Amino acid sequence: MTKLPGLALLLLLTACTIVEEVPDSLNTGSWQAHQASLQGMHHWFATGRAAINNGTESWHVNMLWLQQGNNYQIRLFGPFGAGQVQLTGNSDQVELLTSDNERFYSHNIDTLLYERTGVKMPVAELRYWLIGLPSPAGKDAASVDSHGRLSRLQQGEWRVRYKRYVSVNGLVLPGKIFADKKDLDVRVVIDEWKLGIQTLNNPFNDKG
């Protein structure tokens, strides 16, 4: 796999500890404290898998996601002719690179992915859902558990359910997320979280 210059991250990783789901309760203070800690997460790297079903077709993809502030790089492996696509961008523009080194550009990451691969996935929202926050793009109705973590979230047509949390470097982050709307079901499992700041090593090196 091609190594990607210029993207690097000081990785501070400890073993993930599973935190079991607990019943919902109204715990505003705990949620506000938990939300503040997540909003301070500007640099992270997640390795995981996603299953996507639109009622007639289904896809399974492996996923690598690097977030550095507003900049991201996402690699999806699986249903693209046994190849991969790479999405690189920020809040203004995104580039999609195919395994044939074709490059496509757009201002909408979800539309670009669908037009070039046929796969629908709420990538713009997942940036926030993956770490346990509502997307700021839409109105939401949320339920939190007794530890102040999201357990359920309604954003527009999307219903998001948090099925498992893991403890990473003192933060509690999602380990399994289900999201669905009328014509689409997306299930994401995070196998590994890496957190850190500043630049030293390319986190993709360990995966390539």
Q: Language-model features: where?
A:
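Gly/Pro-enriched, hydrophobic low-complexity segments
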Residues: G132-G208
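An acidic-aromatic
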Residues: N71-K120
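Solvent-exposed helix/loop surface patches that form functional interfaces
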Residues: T111-D140, V144-H147
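C-terminal motif of bacterial Sec signal peptides marking the signal peptidase cleavage site
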Residues: L12-A15
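Solvent-exposed loop/turn segments connecting transmembrane beta-strands
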Residues: N54-S58, P79-A82, K182-D183
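Sec-dependent signal peptide recognition
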Residues: T2-L10
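Bacterial signal peptide processing site
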Residues: T17-E20
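A short, Trp-centered hydrophobic/proline-enriched beta-strand micro-motif
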Residues: H34-G55
